[in-house]
């Protein structure tokens, strides 16, 4: 049996037409633990955390969680959040080694997305297409490594508090953004770090900048997935802007799951897209 497994940083909890599993991350506070399993009300969580004064953090899946997701399959393709900022990829890889030791006939490929959110959805959907084409294991792995070079992630955030609190960006950047009431535009870098590209005032300016960044990163008219945390109006507006600028653009809007909502926070947008060479 062939199976695709992703961690919940993808905000993807089901994938039609293929055997599929999502491995949840957790959002942890002093008072409760949120399991990002697809049933979590992510906007409600983000709203509660906005005024929460205690410590918060995230917890990645452990080896056992990944092993459970692999169980019963003999050809497994796992996609994880960037290994630069999370231990999920390492746990998935260690689980793959253990699973293959116990099941010598099985083959497991772990792909570090070097990203999060909607870029993982692009990767998972491309992977599904390859499997359904009947490609062999080695061919699928090679093509996924190639395709990963041509998918990208941009983000627009109203708040950087949780990113700074968990060491994902510098606290000084978050403090300046808060004081000046600005939105931050950033991207996932080629090594899986979160880089700030620019700061803008107002949502319209942020959306315009995203369109410019799409063009600057080689987007022409491929797939775009816009994920939002409690901000459907901005996501829909951006979708129409992209379609107006790029003829034939394949754009759709989704919602951030728990992990992405924790880091994007209320109002945040995450934009996964393919460049022209995808």
Describe the residue ranges of each PLM region.
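Class I S-adenosyl-L-methionine
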Residues: 32-101
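A glycine-rich beta-strand to alpha-helix segment
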Residues: 80, 109-110
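Mixed-charge interfacial surface used for oligomerization/domain docking
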Residues: 2-3, 9-27, 31-32, 85-88, ...
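A short helix->loop->beta-strand "cap" motif at the edges of active sites that frequently abuts
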Residues: 105-106
